[in-house]
Amino acid sequence: SNMWHAGVKGVTYMACNTDRKSLNINPVSNKVRLGTEGLGAGNRPERGRDAAIASLEDIRRYLMESGCRMVFITAGMGGGTGTVAAPVIAKLAKEMEMLTVGIVTSPLVSEGKRRWKQAMEAIAQLEQNVDALLVIDNDNVVRAYDDLPLHEAFSRADDVLSTATRGIAEIVTRESDLVGVDFADVAEVMRNCGRAHMSVTSACGENRVDKVLKASLCSPLLGHQEITGAKNILLNFSVPDSDELKTREVKQV
C-alpha cells in the first residue's frame, strides 16, 4: 500500500495476502486472496505456502492479462505469508519468462532467532527463483534512523522498500531527452544476475553530482556491502527540467 500511495507511474499493482481483513483495507484495486480460508497464515509458513500454491492460477491469469514484462515481488521476510508465498509467485513469473525482481526486507535481529531463520531460508529459496534479488536489512535502516521514535524508524524501513522499487521502475518508465534507458537495457543488466544491491540518494546545489555519488555509497540500502566486485552497474540520474545536467557533470559521472 505504501508503494501504491507513492504513485509510481507505469506500474500496475497486485496485492496478495491470506488475510481477508488486510486485503479489504488495502487500497490496491487488484487483489488475490491466497487460499480459501481468509484468516491469515498465523506465522505458519506451511499454511502460507499451501495458500499461495492454491491461488497460482489466479495469479497466472492476472499476469497474462496485464501484459507485463517485468515483475517486482516485495515482501517482509520472517512471517507466515510473504515469507513463503514470495518464492512460489516468483517461480511462476520466471516460468512465464518475465524479468523477475525480488525486493524484500529481512527482520530485525531483536525479532528472534526463529523469525530470522525462517527469513533466511525463504530468501535463499527466493534467490533461486528470481533474476535479481535485493535484500534490505531492516537493522541497517533502523540504525541509520536511530534518533527517531521506533514507529517512525519502521516507517522509514517501509519507505526504503518503496524507494527501491520506484527507483528501478522509473528507469524503465520515465522518458529522457538525453540517454534513454529502456526495458532491454534493464533486462541485460538484471537478467539472471542473482544478488543485487541498490542505492537511491539525492543532492542539490554546488557539487551535487559529487555529493550524490558519495552519498550513494553510504545509503541504508547498501548497508556494509561492497560493490567493487559488481559485474554490471546501472546508473540513472533524474533532474528537473529547469536545472538539467551540465556537460561537465555528465563527464564527471
Cite the ranges covered by each PLM segment:
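Tubulin/FtsZ superfamily GTPase core signature
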Residues: 1-253
